[in-house]
Amino acid sequence: MSDHTDSFIAHLEALQARDRGALAALRHSLAFAPGSYPRAYPYVERFAGHAAHERDARRLALYAVAGLFALHPQQAARSLGSALGELYRDGSGSIEGRFIALLGADAENIVEYLRQAISLLAAKSIGLDYGRLLDDLTQWMNSGNDPGRLRQRWARDFYRAAQPTPDTPLETA
């Protein structure tokens, strides 16, 4: 991760600690396209830096991650795929289908799928690495990139984390 990514995540964590109103505005921003909710601008725009236009992939990813963090501000050292795989392993059977649908999303609707996934993680208090998610989303939302490799990495992380651990009882038919 870059210093810019680390600074942005530290900024979100500081907002969590001291400004519930900011988190409310960022959560509400998820009802809009990334970067189009004016009340979120004071908390995100300064990090957009040299984003040349309103559809810049990094700018869109910053807004998306800010809203997702506000929805579930639990930072952890696991990727999105690993977090969802852990949720699946812990007995949430419908997660696999939702995860496959998320992998099939395009740049225009990925945030909606992520909002649903993050809500499920929040319900089970499973955190994830928002800095990594920011970098991943920047790639996903870049129209010049094919998100195929990212999809494959998320799938590998999911299925590795979904494997039963030695102390997990196996289901019987």
Which sequence ranges carry the predicted segments?
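Basic, alpha-helical nucleic-acid-binding regions used in initiation and control of genome expression
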Residues: F8-A173
